[in-house]
Amino acid sequence: MRHIQQPGPPGPTRIIAHPVRAQAVDEELPRGASLLTALHELARAHGAEGGCLTLSGGALGPFAYVIPALAPDPSHAAYYSDTFRPTGATRLDIASITVGFRDGAPFFHCHGFWTEADGRPGGGHMLPEETIIAAPIRAQGVLIAGARFEARQDAETGFKLFTPVATTPQNATSANGIAIRLCPNQDITAALEAAAAGAGFGAARLHGGVGSIIGARYANAPPVDNFATEMLIRDGVIRPGATRLDVAMVDLTGQLSAGVLTPGNNPVLMTLEAVLTPV
């Protein structure tokens, strides 16, 4: 399986998971609002501190994004491109988003795919500080209590990454999901199956799904050989030996791809964030 050497030592825990109370939501985010503000107001209205969601429809404008790039120095295994700022309203096709906190303030980690005003399809890592809703966007997924995603410095990758952190204890009767982060160089399918099994879930639904893998090996599409990607999970069901992960990604050349991942051959590059609930 492919492997990318990270600049720092791997931590002892490769699957970080905390029990949560997950609340399903399906709501519309209003035109004119900052995406960051709208999402945190949604969470607050439901007594939550964030969550993992899929966004669809509507439009963004103005907004800004980056795509993967080669690292300029050995302090990271990969990095970000210069910032792109499309003109006009950009129609959102799909995005996966983790809503949490960075340095005590609201923050999100979001990978999306869209069609720009000139008809050009695009995708990448959307910047929280520069993303405004130009037409109402549908938000579906789960909000969480009992833990929240906090951006913390990660010694292995050199990045400040979202990781689930317990906020209030969740006992066996109140918890109905787990918030997770997967660390680098482990197969994404095997790790998700292990996370679900560790929580006692015979099968699980994946919510959100923001991260990166080392290129891609699809069951139904040509492979992606460039190692640096930004990925979202469009649909994920976790079952022992029968997990199905339907993803979309952009690589460091800007090439877009999508398909169902081949189990056992798609290692995590930097991270994967998600919430799992039993089915």
Short names for language-model regions:
Residues 164-174:
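A short mid-domain helix/strand-loop element embedded in enzyme catalytic domains
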Residues 1-115, 174-211, 220-279:
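Alpha/propeptide regions of enzymes that mature by internal proteolysis
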Residues 121-166, 264-279:
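Flexible glycine-rich active-site/ligand-binding loops centered on an Asp-His dyad
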